[in-house]
A protein has these predicted regions:
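Transmembrane helix-loop-helix hairpins at membrane boundaries of multipass inner-membrane proteins
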Residues: 1-5, 12-107, 181-192
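Structural signature of hydrophobic alpha-helical transmembrane segments
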Residues: 1-9, 72-82, 125-138, 196-209
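Divalent metal-coordination and catalytic microenvironments
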Residues: 10, 71, 124, 164, ...
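C-terminal ends of transmembrane helices
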Residues: 15-25, 86-99, 141-150, 154, ...
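Helix-boundary and loop/linker segments of multi-pass membrane transporters
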Residues: 67, 151, 190-197, 224-228
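Hydrophobic/aromatic residues within the transmembrane alpha-helices of Major Facilitator Superfamily
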Residues: 83, 90, 167, 207-213
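Short helix-boundary/re-entrant hairpin motifs in multi-pass inner-membrane proteins
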Residues: 104, 154, 200-236
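Alpha-helical multi-pass transmembrane bundles of energy-transducing inner-membrane proteins
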Residues: 104-194
Length: 236
């Protein structure tokens, strides 16, 4: 239950900003930082009291489910994110005083925190794929925040490069399970006779996730995305 609350708090808090009117930049900053800090505190409570329990959000069918789990890898990524986000927020308050639509910016900024944690806590490949794609979509408005020609062009490039991560779906199709299993998830019987195709599938997956992570030489979108407000660029 605490895991769901940790992800839901910044998502709902960020979404609510679209309906709120703040009397000043200070009141907006207090609201955002309170949600971000509370989320980070909940995250560290999860990390320090973690169990190997898998929490299922929903079943898509008998094999695919959106699920969360706090494991060793989750601790690394979620711990890092929970430190970076509050610090970037503090910088963002001052920065956005000179930008338009700060409410919209901090709304998507806060919701991006939720989706990033969902990626970190993903219990299986399907969940990782879904939330990684959601992260692309939820951060797109931040990249094109200025809504000028350069930012729109950068947003298109960002979207085109990032959506290529869908190649992961091919690997899931050949797997016996979508869980993260030490030693691999592929069924030798299912892939028999398709070894060459499988190599191509792995290449697509590497390119897809490598592009999202801006791994050399697939980083062309990252310099273009620098037109986004600096707090976003820092987190990207």
């Amino acid at each position: 239950m605490l895991l769901f609350l940790t992800i839901a708090l910044p998502m709902l808090g960020g979404a609510a900003m679209g309906l709120m009117r703040f009397s000043s930049a200070k009141s907006r900053g207090i609201y955002v930082e309170t949600i971000v800090l509370a989320t980070s505190i909940l995250t560290w409570v999860l990390l320090l009291t973690r169990t190997d329990t898998t929490y299922v959000l929903c079943h898509m069918n008998s094999e695919l489910a959106l699920a969360f789990r706090v494991d060793g890898m989750s601790c690394i990524f979620a711990g890092l994110v929970s430190i970076l986000w509050p610090l970037a927020s503090l910088y963002g308050f001052e920065y956005m005083q000179h930008e338009e639509r700060p409410n919209t910016f901090f709304s998507y900024y806060t919701m991006s925190y939720a989706v990033t944690l969902a990626v970190a806590f993903s219990a299986n490949l399907f969940s990782l794929y879904v939330f990684y794609e959601c992260l692309t979509l939820i951060t797109l408005p931040l990249v094109i925040h200025k809504k000028d020609t350069m930012s729109i062009r950068a947003g298109r490039k960002y979207l085109t490069f990032s959506i290529s991560g869908a190649a992961l779906a091919f690997i899931i199709y050949y797997g016996t399970t979508t869980d993260f299993v030490l030693g691999g998830v592929l069924d030798a019987e299912k892939i028999s006779g398709m070894e060459e195709l499988l190599k191509f599938v792995f290449l697509l997956a590497f390119v897809g996730f490598g592009t999202k992570a801006a791994v050399f030489p697939m980083y062309a979108w990252l310099p273009a995305a620098s037109v986004a407000p600096t707090p976003v660029t820092a987190l990207l």
